[in-house]
Amino acid sequence: MKKLTTLILALLGLTGASCASDYEMDTFHTKSGKEVRFHALVHASIRIQYNGLEIQVDPVRELGNRTIDYTAMPKADYILITHEHGDHFDKEAIKQLEDKGTMVILNGRCSEMLGYGEKMKNYDQLHLSEDISIEAVPAYNITEGRTQFHPKGRDNGYILTLDGLRIYIAGDTEDIPEMAEIKDIDIAFLPCNQPYTMTTEQLVRAARTIRPRVLFPYHYGQTNVSGLPTELKDDGVDVRIRHYE
């Protein structure tokens, strides 16, 4: 089973990781051979490079004692914002990454706060080009005493499809029932930061529901996620721990 899983991952280009500059980088290939690079910036901030394009997810300049210099990066073609909290939504970071051709894609609340952008609500779909599409999916809390953090219907997760490579960026959520509808995911970013998102037990349940080929726990703060690769080993999920504290 392990050899078969490795073979499938290799055929999909879902193997190997490398370091680029100051950030860990994982490189994947789409079925037609186009390269996709993921740079682990911080917490929930992800830089994605695809086919000459720059995609930034929830860019923030500062978190704890870590800072990100977005002025040293290329301007973004697309910026995705999941919700309004300060560890996901940073107006100044957006300004530093914007050019006249940049499209900012965000939920309704962030659109109001920013004053512009391509607004998406849960289940909206957006076709950006022949080979790029985005679907907004629910992201919310369900545990009693936590629902005020991320109420149902307000925030977004995103399924980003790049030349057939399906990437699930969950945003701040628990293991909600809607995850059963999320299928054929190649790469998933799932949050693990109690009490705001998932416990490690919830993340394992979510991973077993979604069954991504590769899983990056992210947004994990001080939560110990080191045991997740072992816990999900027999489920055929390649868990990669990067600096998404």
Name the predicted role of every residue range.
Residues 56-59, 76-87, 104-108, 168-171, ...:
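Active-site neighborhood of phospho(di)ester-bond hydrolases with catalytic His/Asp-centered motifs
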Residues 68-129:
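Active-site HxH/HxHxD metal-binding segment of metal-dependent hydrolases
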Residues 115-132, 152, 204, 208-245:
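Binuclear metal-ion centers of metallo-dependent hydrolases, dominated by the metallo-beta-lactamase
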Residues 141-209:
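Active-site-proximal loop/helix segments of hydrolase catalytic cores
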Residues 30-38, 49-55, 125-135, 161-167:
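Beta-strand-turn-beta hairpins that frame and shape the catalytic cleft
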Residues 23-33, 41, 45-84, 91-95, ...:
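Pre-active-site segment of Zn-dependent metallo-hydrolases
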Residues 1-51, 231-235, 244:
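Zn-dependent metallo-beta-lactamase
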Residues 62-65, 85-89, 111-114, 125-127, ...:
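Active-site environment of divalent metal-dependent phosphoester hydrolases
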